[in-house]
């Protein structure tokens, strides 16, 4: 295996984590930014400072906190979130009954979505030539209290 593609020891990775309330809808949406660094990947220009090897951006969504504005809030953020919201929820942020009905539902959604936060991952980026095939993002999100 090429030295550039050697798997990194993921136990040595460090995570920096930021949660920022949304400017317009802080009760319903929070931005999540997760950056992963590894001690073997250092900048040659800035005093050997660790450089990021991977990034994750996501939203924490609280549908239950939106009152009757859930779909409008999702629509104001992005087309992707609007489509997600309109597919699964009503305007009050409640999961559509057709998805949880025992006879009609698909069996993987339940009424617990009416009172739980949702982590919607928007983007994951990994530096080229970094082998992180077994990288467990949820490990870092859990460590920082997101899950």
Spans of features found by a protein language model:
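Hydrophobic positions on the alpha1 helix immediately C-terminal to the Walker A/P-loop
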Residues: 139
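Non-catalytic substrate-recognition and accessory regions of acyl/acetyltransferase enzymes
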Residues: 1-131, 142-147
